[in-house]
Amino acid sequence: MNIDVGRQSNGQGHETVHAGFPADQSGLSADRIQMFCSDRGRNAQGDDTSGPGSAAIRANAPRAAVDRMIAAFTSFLAQEMGVAEDVVEFDGETFWAPGSNLTPTMLEAMEMARAQGRTDLQRHAARAGLPDSSLPDGANISEIVIDPEAGQTDQVRYTVVDDFGNLINLMSAEGQVNGGAAQGLEQTMLERVVFDAEGRLLTVSFLGCALPRASRVPMIGITTEPVPLAQNQLGMNGSGEAGAAGAPVAVANAVQDRGIRQVDMPFTPSRIWEVLRDVSEAAEQ
């Protein structure tokens, strides 16, 4: 089975995630399913991955297409079995009907249709529109230690609890949260673009900008508390932006807990040291 979806995978694991439900629905093993993501040579419609909508929107389309495929083969096999269409059942592994000894799997049904030249059973398409709403929820907890003498801020523990609705693949969801949180933490602590007085760019590489560093990102504790969403068939919410969106706010609140009322990101040692000095001087007056 080839599955074409109109969204490009850039490391999010669409080829694994989007194939999961069709495999379960059709009874085909994973090695029988091949994913094509936003391939304009095969599908005229497609775009990149942006926003947390790939699962909540796009995953419903392959599911609907497989439902149509099952319905089409049910009709085809009813004729082969010599029974009424409404008595043919597909139990996730085989088609069957009372009074018939014919019990083909989905793959066997496909081979039967091909042998009879039924090309109309080779392609099944479906659209998935935007859900009425997507309501992911969660909490990010940042625990930091600030060295007042140097202004150094160290992230010692980071905990995330998220509700993304039903999860297709827990490992993929946790990976996105992990990577997003690492990006958000580094954005909060170091990421910036600096120009000199003449407008020349000083942060000309990722060493200065900067990319997340493993030494600065703690082990991130992730817990999921899924509540199925009623607005789409699969009960899923988006998850792609959760880690990156929650981290800056959590760290900023942790910094404020030190008595710092206002400081612009990134929270570099020099900025934190200057603000702590001002706080100390104000307290002495």
Task: Indicate where each model-derived feature is located.
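Cofactor-binding beta-sheet edge motifs in enzyme active sites
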Residues: 1-285
